[in-house]
């Protein structure tokens, strides 16, 4: 489904890669009981490696996978969790130029998000994505530094990459959508980022079925399968009813 992230060439803005995408930076989670979520992540081998300087936000990491748990009461994440329950409320793409990617996304019809930015805190541009979740654009990574050096304090050594359970990178993030909405979201990613479909599945079970379009970014490092139910009895429909909307579903590492 694309090159192993470390083998892919550095991102450049081009006709093929108009946003200069370069992989995932993080996934942000919200939970009515953030401590319980933290315990689950630690059982999976993630470690709390940094804490936000002024907010109840913790960075968990394993290998190159960054999971942010946002427990800040007065935040987008808290409001999102109050509406949807435990969820992935945001994700971030690495891009060559965050300002350029944000402005291009808005010009192509994406809905901007303007959040609260505290003193001495980075302002990371974002748009509304699947189910009203946020999609951030990050260009501060690798040789250009780290967003975590600015907004977070490391709990131990700087920028560690613990490898507790053998997870190294985020392979893909699944989206579950309402029936009839798959083409809309596939078109959204194609229009903004030039994602392409690399595989189509039509899975029919004894009682229910689903279709899935597996999309990948021009850089080959971001993969998003979009799932749609074929009826109202499937597990996907159950997820959507319980969640009260379309969602960032499973994160696969």
Residue ranges of predicted features:
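Eukaryotic intrinsically disordered and solvent-exposed regulatory patches
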Residues: 12-13, 160, 201
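Conserved small/polar residues in nucleotide/adenosyl-binding loops
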Residues: 251-253
């Amino acid at each position: 489904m694309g090159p192993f992230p470390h083998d892919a060439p550095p991102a450049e803005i081009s006709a093929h890669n108009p946003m200069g995408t370069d992989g995932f930076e993080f996934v942000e989670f919200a939970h009515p009981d953030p401590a319980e979520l933290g315990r689950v992540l630690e059982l999976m081998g993630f470690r709390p490696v940094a804490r936000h300087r002024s907010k109840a936000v913790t960075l968990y990491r394993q290998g190159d996978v960054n999971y942010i748990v946002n427990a800040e009461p007065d935040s987008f994440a808290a409001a999102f969790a109050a509406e949807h329950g435990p969820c992935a409320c945001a994700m971030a793409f690495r891009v060559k130029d965050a300002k350029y990617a944000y402005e291009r996304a808005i010009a192509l019809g994406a809905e901007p998000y303007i959040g609260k930015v505290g003193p001495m805190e980075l302002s990371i541009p974002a748009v509304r994505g699947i189910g009203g979740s946020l999609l951030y654009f990050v260009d501060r990574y690798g040789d250009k530094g780290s967003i975590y050096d600015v907004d977070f304090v490391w709990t131990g050594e700087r920028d560690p990459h613990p490898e507790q359970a053998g997870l190294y990178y985020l392979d893909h993030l699944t989206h579950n959508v309402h029936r009839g909405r798959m083409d809309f979201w596939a078109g959204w990613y194609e229009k903004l980022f030039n994602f392409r479909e690399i595989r189509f599945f039509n899975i029919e079970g004894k009682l229910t079925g689903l279709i899935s379009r597996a999309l990948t970014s021009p850089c080959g490092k971001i993969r998003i399968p979009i799932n749609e139910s074929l009826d109202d009895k499937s597990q996907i429909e159950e997820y959507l009813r319980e969640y009260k909307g379309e969602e960032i579903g499973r994160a696969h590492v």
